[in-house]
């Protein structure tokens, strides 16, 4: 189901509240004006998943990402092809799948709905159609991926320290 401008126009208080809530809670939308958010949302596809559904699968190709409107999503990675290891849990306002949007390569991890989820699916096509919005979104994606890389580096440092302590 896709939203149309009529679905999310600033005509009702509820619709204005939705846009305002997204503007405040979704880091990906930081720096967008209300009109820009409305234009982006009009291009986005609304997706609904039941608990346990895979949203994206590690190894598949994708040129889109998701923003969580409601629900919880778990990010997992296969370890040695034998089991899935949880890496992160995301909730409303968070986004995932950005790497494939940026580089159009295979997904590096899977995402599974932990609860029923309502998501916005965004593709690079929306950002190309509206270059001014795309530039802001891609900058926000760069900041988000940078923060995640810093967190990953910190975790690797802790694991290396634990390994060094165990070997001593």
Residue ranges and their predicted role:
Residues 1-168:
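Cytosolic regulatory regions built on CNB/CRP/Popeye-like sensor folds
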